[in-house]
């Protein structure tokens, strides 16, 4: 248990040290009605259940601590395919790599750190989504806090909608990406 807490603390510290904001000396007005880039993606997650190592795209590396009914303390790492449509078998256009941890003791709640990594003819680079994901809500807005490549220093909003759940083995999330600072 001490090793799990140490591992969790080390991962959180690494994320905080790797993410930084660039402060500029000028204010740029943002038109929230007109993002500079917008696209809709679909994340597909297959949870590891002990028998599906070849197909699993996520795995719990710290299990719930038994402190309630809402998986408090569970820590999941993921490398999920992202498609342009809802079909899991469609060609992936990106991957979501990162983690989420359940941190609500009174309701299902997760804090996420995801990097959407593109390597296609259309886009190269990545952007990062971080924040509170109250996934029992129909839609959730999470901040996009930066990026690389085609998404260098981008900022925006990712609106998440869980559009399919198959027990604890599979879920699909629609990502409505709206970027408001674009340099490419």
From Swiss-Prot:
Signal sequence range: 1-20
Keywords (A to Z) from UniProt: Apoplast, Disulfide bond, Glycoprotein, Secreted, Signal
Gene3D superfamilies: Allene oxide cyclase-like
Family from the record: Belongs to the plant dirigent protein family.
Subcellular location: Secreted, Extracellular space, Apoplast
Glycosylation sites: 55, 119
UniProt cross-references to InterPro entries, sorted A to Z: Allene_oxi_cyc_Dirigent, Dirigent
Any Pfam family matching the protein: Dirigent
Subunit: Homodimer.
Disulphide linkage map: 36-182
GO biological process: phenylpropanoid biosynthetic process
Protein name: Dirigent protein 14
Organism listed in the record: Arabidopsis thaliana (Mouse-ear cress)
Record function comment: Dirigent proteins impart stereoselectivity on the phenoxy radical-coupling reaction, yielding optically active lignans from two molecules of coniferyl alcohol in the biosynthesis of lignans, flavonolignans, and alkaloids and thus plays a central role in plant secondary metabolism.
Domain of life: Eukaryota
Main location: secreted
Ranges that cross the membrane: none
Entry GO terms, CC: apoplast
